[in-house]
Structures are given as C-alpha cells and as structure tokens.
Amino acid sequence: MKIWLLLGLLLMHEALEDVTGQHPPKNKRPKEPGENRIKPTNKKVKPKIPKIKDRDSADPTPKTQSIMTQMMDKGRFQKPAATLSLVAGQTLELRCKGNKIGWSYPAYLDTFKDTRLSVKQHERYGQLTLVNSTAADTGEFSCWGQLCTGYVCRRDEAKTGSTYIFFTEKGELFVPSPSHFDVVYLNPDRQAVVPCRVTVLSAKVTLHREFPAKEIPANGTDIVYDLKRGFVYLQPHVGHQGVVYCKAEAGGKSQISVKYQLLYAEVPRGPPSTTILASSNKVKGGDDVSVLCTVLGEPDVEVEFRWTYPGQKDERPVTIQDSWRLIHRGLGHTTRISQSVLSIEDFETIDAGYYICTAQNLQGQTTVATTVESS
C-alpha cells in the first residue's frame, strides 16, 4: 500500500514540472542572454513621421515693404489705404522713406506744369505736397526707392508705396476732361480704354452708345469696367466703333461724361513702316531738290524723324519740315501718315550722295536711304 502511494506522488511531481515550464518545449528556441524578453503583441501602431519644412516651397522673393505714409491732422502720420477719398480743396502730403525716392502721379499735374504740386527730397525721406486739390487730381500716387550706382539709378521693387485717391468735388462725378470730345483708337492686337473715371468711389457707371441710343453692357468678357481706368474693351473690333458716352450716378445725382469717338485702326503695332523718295535722283547744279520720308502707322502713335545727308558735316543749309495727318479709309479704318521733307536750294556738288532717314516710335526704328546725283 505504501509502495503505491509513493509511486503516485512521484508521477504527480513529474507532471507539475512539465506544467511550470522547467523543461523548455522542443519546438521553441531558447532565448540568448540579453535578448529582449518582452512578448510581441498584434496591436498595429502608426509610425510618427517628423514634420519637415519644405524649403523649396517657401517664396524666395522678398516681401514688398510699403514706404509711404500720409500726413494727417496735428502732425500725425499713417500708412494710406489702397484707395482714399478726400474732399477737393484739401492739402495732400505724402512721404516715402529713403534718401533717393522716385514719384509717379496723375499725368494731368505734369502736363500743365502745375505749381500746386511740390516734390522734394530730404535727407531721409521724399515728400510730395499737393495744395488746393481738385477733382481733376484724382488718380494713382506712388513712390519707390532708387538704387544708384554713380548717375545710373534703378527702381528698388522691394521698397514701394502707392495709393489711388478720389478727390470728390461738388458737381463733378467724372474726372474732368480738357476737351468735350475725345478720340479712342481701337486696335485688334491690344485693349482699348474709354477713360470714364469717377471722383466718387461708390458711383455707379454705365456705358452708352449715342446712335442707335442704347446702353452697352459691361459683361466682363468683352467689356469690363475698371474703377481706375474706365471701360476696357478687351478685344476691340470694327463693330465697336461709333460715338459713346458714360453716365454716373451717386447720392441721388447723375452726370453725363464727354463723348468719345471710337475709331478702328487696322495697322498693327511695330516699328515704323517707312519709305523714302527724292523729287529727282539726278539734279543739275543750281536746281532745287527735296527728299520725302513717309511713315504709315497707328493713329495714336507719334513718330520722330532724323536725317543724315552729304553736306551735313560742312553745315550745308537745309530745310526740314515734319507733319502728320489721319486718313479714313472707309469702314471706320484709320491710318496716320507722318512725313518729313528735307529741302535743298541751289544744288551743288557737295550735296550729291546718300540721304538717310531714320523714323522712330516707341516700338523701334526703321532706316531708309536714297541717292541724289549731280547730272
């Protein structure tokens, strides 16, 4: 009986050793010393990716710094808004920080050499002062710093300032025009502007055709209204020609602008199209001779002429006369003819040779030549 009891206890002890894991299973590798003994779990963990600033996406161009301030009452200064409304008669004083400041203001003030305008450069700032302001002074006022090397200066685009100012005046909803009838040329290769600018920011402006009488809608695709420019024809064509005017309404009052004649110009923009012709290419001594230089171009593009001729070095007296006129070629097409005539009296041997004419406009220049010989 005791033998069976001892045998049972021995078998129970063997079973307990297997359960407590004192003998490692044959199908599992024993852990090496120092090996991580933390059991892995099946939980998925989203890796954290550190945020890296994209240097390439940063704008490398420096931010423009506004250098303009406006003189307020009691000696206070503040940066002007993009648009300002001032009552006509007020004094305007603008300052721009810098020891070399360039200015731009409505061309009206330059055209008439207006003494109401004063521009001064001080040691640390530029100053623009306009006294006795009127509705005609409405427009863009801007300034910029200048980077100079010797006598050559260039605009510093990082230091600029600008504001568009409406000078409101009783009875003047439109910026006054020096004439009662203006001409606007329509070119197929660029925008055309009917300059109906107002003096009141909140004014409602419409465009009208005189005959047949109707309103011309500014639909945003063919014609748009720009507060600072007027009605802009985005793609002018022959059908736009005619007489138009603008109507402004503000504060229960309305006003009609001057009339504008829209003329279509078919000559494309570019350097002058120039020809030269002598009254005779063989001239006898003592006779008179003239050389004509002609340019066909756009109606609103001015042309300048320069001459080179045989007797120029010897200061041979010549007469040079420039002129221009518009030619209407039907269907509203208009061309400008600019001419320069060089005339010589009592032709001499010294006058024989090449006569060279150079015509220049804003797009470039063209040089033509002809010979005049002594017969």
From Swiss-Prot:
Top-rank taxon: Eukaryota
Principal cellular location given in the protein's record: secreted
Residue pairs linked by disulfide bridges in the UniProt entry: 96-143, 293-357
PROSITE patterns: IG_LIKE
Keywords annotated in UniProt: Disulfide bond, Glycoprotein, Immunoglobulin domain, Repeat, Secreted, Signal
Carbohydrate-modified residues: 132, 219
Pfam families: Ig_3, VEGFR-1-like_Ig-like
Subunit structure: Forms a complex composed of PDGFRL, TNK2 and GRB2.
Protein name: Platelet-derived growth factor receptor-like protein
